[in-house]
A protein has these predicted regions:
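Short, Lys/Arg-enriched, Trp-marked, Pro/Gly-tolerant hinge/linker segments that flank
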Residues: 2-3, 126-132, 181
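Secondary-structure edge/capping motif, primarily at the C-terminal ends of alpha-helices
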Residues: 67, 90-94, 121-124, 150-154, ...
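Amphipathic alpha-helical packing segments from all-alpha helical-bundle domains
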Residues: 99-124, 130-145, 175
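C-terminal peripheral helix-coil segments that are non-catalytic and often amphipathic
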Residues: 149, 153-186
Length: 186
């Protein structure tokens, strides 16, 4: 029951963000839209920033629990599509004091996508977990930078084109990084 209430509050917040910026949304607006009392909100969340963080983490967990992408390109495109589905929410959060919540959300999703690829490719290499984590984080920050730039410019450019351009630039880089750091087994 608790998650149902949290998701209802989250849906109310997202709905309100279609109408006004986050700094104009109050707890009362959210609870009225949701049909619950203010105490219910405060039972689950400390403040709106806490709800934003929970919403980001909940959305990320849905993606993480979903099907495994067949390639990093498919996973990266999935990230763009997820963001575009919640465009009003993402843009509002991106341009607010809660931007760090959105960044953590994106970092966790992109980390998962890159980790799957690195884990699969690195199985034939002798590389430490620390070295793999360095590679994953390198690509995570690179890819998130591209996503943040896209958000900053209003999400206008077609995500498929961005993924194709990124793929052209990054083709073979994970394998090359593993070649440079590890010993390949035949």
């Amino acid at each position: 029951m608790s998650d149902i209430t949290k998701r209802a509050l989250s849906a109310s917040l997202k709905s309100l963000l279609l109408e006004k910026p986050i700094d104009k949304v109050s707890v009362l607006d959210i609870t009225n839209r949701c049909g619950v009392k203010r105490q219910t909100f405060y039972y689950h969340f400390q403040d709106i920033a806490d709800l934003v963080e929970w919403t980001c983490l909940d959305d990320a967990s849905k993606v993480i629990a979903g099907k495994k992408p067949s390639s990093w390109q498919e996973g990266f495109l999935e990230v763009f599509n997820l963001i575009k589905q919640d465009k009003a929410f993402v843009l509002n959060i991106y341009h607010s004091v809660s931007r760090d919540k959105l960044e953590l959300y994106l970092y966790s999703i992109v980390y998962r996508v890159i980790k799957q690829v690195v884990d699969e490719v690195s199985s034939s290499y002798s590389v430490s977990d620390e070295e793999k984590d360095f590679i994953i984080n390198f690509f995570k920050y690179s890819f998130c930078g591209i996503v943040f730039n896209w958000i900053d410019k209003g999400m206008v450019k077609d995500p498929k084109i961005i993924v194709e351009q990124t793929s052209s630039l990054c083709s073979g880089l994970i394998v090359r990084a593993l070649d440079n750091l590890g010993v390949k087994h035949n």
